[in-house]
Amino acid sequence: MTTETLLIELGTEELPPKSLKTLATAFYDNIKGQLDSHNLSYSDIKWFATPRRFAVQVFDLVEKQDDKIVEKRGPAVNVAFDDAGNASKAAQGWARSNGIEVDQAERLVTGKGEWLLHRATVSGKAVVELIPDMVTTALNKLPIAKPMRWGAERTQFIRPVQTLTMLFGSDIIAGEALGVSSSNQVQGHRFHHEGLVTINHANDYQAELAKAYVEVDFNERQNKIVAQIKQVANDIDAVALIDEELLNEVTALVEWPVTLVGTFDEDFLNVPAEPLIYSMKDHQKYFPVTDKNGQLVNKFIFVTNIESKDPNTIIFGNEKVIRPRLADAEFFFKTDKKQSLESRLKSLESVLFQKQLGTLKAKSERIASLSQFIAEQLNENAQDAYRAGLLSKTDLMSDMVLEFPQVQGTMGKYYALHDGENENIAQALEDQYRPRFAGDSLPEANIGCAVAISDKIDSLVGIFGINQAPKGDKDPFALRRAAIGSIRIIIEKQLDLDLSTLINKSIELFGDKLVNENTATDVLEFIMGRFRAFYQEQGISVDVIQAVLAKKPSAPLDFEKRIKAVTFFGELPEAATLAAANKRVGNILAKFDGELYQSFNTDLATEQAERDLADIYRDISLKVAPLMADKNYQAALSELAQLKAPIDTFFDGVMVMSDDEAVKINRLTLLNQIRNSFFAIADISVLQ
């Protein structure tokens, strides 16, 4: 069958840069889904996106659907004909609806009877007939939160639509979408190529747009931007800070990237680097630059959408724009330092953390007390921990943080050092928000860990305590992130802390503000649920996680040891048999409603296999006890794995549910003791 390249492009006014890639890939997914659902084969499909368009190119697309045979079953033969063999009205009506005579029908014989049958060949539709509706469907399914109208039209889309291009090879596919008819013309560069560009063949799309100063491939354009930035940075013997989110946004802002470098006054470097960096990135979409040692320098790299004959004019304009931004940061820094962090404590009384839970001042005091409590458990400086907790939210009242919320905590560190606070306290102020996201760094020192954990536990306990736990996708206080962050800090920093203890201490600090009587249980259950996500991201199997969750160990380090032990156990050759045996024992005991003995009675053992199992188990138990005391779960499971052979022999030769009640209970007691030894570590019966 003949194949051709399909091109579909929607040309628009400037699309929101933060949404461009999402829109383009969603359109790609939708078109691909439409092609697949219509049984149209192709070799490859590619997506494109610039500020004023998104498109797909489909290669080696068949020109039409395959023909297919459709079987249409009619009435049963005994209904289709009377005794004389004449066709009934039912048979005639069915035949007429299928465009045949009754005697042209085939017969379908099954085990349930015989029916009339018509096999019809349905011709496949041409691609050019299908594409317009497919495009409309793909556009309607795009994730657009706030569509807009333009002109006198009632059509709605994310931005006004200028062109629609639908080409199959060199043929224009007739149709329209969003009020625009299809053509073979697309928009060139807004400044370098003001007219429309004619695409004579779908294969020419990328090359023709390149002539019109449009690099239409998003990924290729991004690669060019990265290469240009690195080259410019290398030319000034510096290193550019290339943030992925900013890079995506800049790529979505330009069609023909040209990268330049600007300079700002060195005096601005007296301001901490972080607010300067955020000002350059967030406000101006510039890439900050450091020296080879990572120190910010008075340069910035920016990407323009114009290949200018006089780039110095563009550079001067951008230098002029960045100057007042950096001057604002400098002013905030100088002004903020006139007031100590401690003096800002009172102003926290005017800011609510949450209506039922009180102000940020009250939260700071709770964080301080819980931080002190944690520091005492870790044998750290409790006084420093309390001080850091108390000052933890004060920088939120500074002008710098009000202007650049991203530097909260970081500015607290700088202001604390300026106030004469010690290094531990200052660093803890910055560390309190860590980890901010998956893969983020953790607090540097244990004082910072104490404050970070306290802040997170306080939020968890408070919000659960007023019955406002996260529901569905709604998590306004970022409690899921708080739970995972607490887990990460405790495990990765190897802190000997118990979540139940911390939760109960936090509840105590809230006084009578909490109304949920089950706060402690609810918070612990919520955090336990985050363990699943935490370990799944590390590639731990779900059944291993489930096995440990059955024990609900509230100390994360203990949880971690059990996970490692069960993972190790699951790889042993004895694991499958012992898991099955534990499950079998659990099922047997679940059906037994009597009372077991305190211990196995050898006098009631009538079979050699049960005596052998009891003896071996006793010897192994003596080895396991000190291992459990040391929480050496892996070694304990290694010892218990030796029970496989005697357990196999026991089940092969011993009737557990003996007619003799005493013997039966004795055997169940032995099996229960063995099961409990495993369950002291994890529920291995769930392993698969």
From Swiss-Prot:
GO molecular function, one term: arginine-tRNA ligase activity
Catalyses which reaction(s): tRNA(Gly) + glycine + ATP = glycyl-tRNA(Gly) + AMP + diphosphate
Principal location listed in the UniProt entry: cytoplasm
Membrane-spanning segments: none
Enzyme Commission number(s) from the entry: 6.1.1.14
Cysteine-cysteine disulfides: none
Keyword Aminoacyl-tRNA synthetase: yes
Enzymatic class: ligase
Compartments, as annotated in UniProt: Cytoplasm
InterPro entries: DALR_anticod-bd (IPR008909), Gly-tRNA-synth_bsu (IPR015944), Gly-tRNA-synth_heterodimer (IPR006194)
Keywords from the UniProt entry: Aminoacyl-tRNA synthetase, ATP-binding, Cytoplasm, Ligase, Nucleotide-binding, Protein biosynthesis
Record GO biological process: arginyl-tRNA aminoacylation; glycyl-tRNA aminoacylation
GO cellular component: cytosol
Record-stated family: Belongs to the class-II aminoacyl-tRNA synthetase family.
Xref: HAMAP family: Gly_tRNA_synth_beta
NCBIfam families to which the protein is assigned, alphabetical: glyS
Quaternary structure (record): Tetramer of two alpha and two beta subunits.
Name of the featured protein: Glycine--tRNA ligase beta subunit
Organism (species): Colwellia psychrerythraea (strain 34H / ATCC BAA-681) (Vibrio psychroerythus)
Taxonomic lineage of the native organism: Bacteria, Pseudomonadati, Pseudomonadota, Gammaproteobacteria, Alteromonadales
